[in-house]
Amino acid sequence: MIDRKCKVTLGGLPQKIHVKGDETKPVLLFLHGGPGVCNRHTVMTVHADLQKDFLVVAWDQRGSGGSYRGAAVETLTIDRLVDDAHELVLWLCREYGRKKVYLLGGSWGSELGTWLAYRYPEHIAAFVGFGQVVNGAKNEELSYQFALEEAQKAGDEKSIAVLKRVGPPVMGVYKGGFDGMMAQRRVMMKYGGYSQSKKKRSYFRSMVVPMLCSGEYSIPDLIGVAKGYRYVLTAM
């Protein structure tokens, strides 16, 4: 069994990965969402069953978590992240004696995985996307409408005022940029829009607490988590 955390230089930037599982199994690279929302803690806990069939690799993409330090804003582009992912695939093939790896991507990770599989199919055994991005702008329209309708049903005037202040997204972008998006997300999560769970949790309880309690991240990693989310999303 392997349980290895290390940094791999991709596109000139040292980036954090966690490799865990049976070295004899096929390699599965997990592509997180956001961009900028690393999820090593969920990959290694919530998705731990994947280790029965795969050597699982969780990666903090450029600008996030353990890959925050030194990530210049001009390098935060889709093309650069696709190239980073390809370089990581090649490194994994060399390191573990494989010809191809499997990809699993959620939300933004599904978009990244689609580009990666399209450009470099010779190194990809298969790609599975969940929460697959097809039309990001439409996603945001539906998300905003859901949050507004739920707040109206609940008579939640405070949340309604917040949503009307940021306004409906235009081409997927909220008024106020990152801050406007986060204001919408807090209302959406308040009314259960984050997952199908019947439990309605705040952004802090849904996203922050699991990271802090997981033990997956070092202090520098957590600083990268806190700073990287805004940094990457604003840049991209």
What label would you give each PLM region?
Residues 157-236:
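Alpha/beta-hydrolase
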Residues 50-69:
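Conserved alpha/beta-hydrolase
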Residues 25-34:
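Short beta-strand element of the alpha/beta-hydrolase
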Residues 98-141:
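Conserved hydrolase catalytic core segment
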Residues 80-100, 115:
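Conserved acidic catalytic loop of the alpha/beta-hydrolase fold
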Residues 38-47:
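The serine-hydrolase catalytic nucleophile loop
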Residues 10-20:
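A short loop-to-beta-strand scaffold at the N-terminal edge of the catalytic core in hydrolase folds
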Residues 124-170:
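A catalytic-pocket lid/entrance helix-loop region that shapes and gates access to the active site
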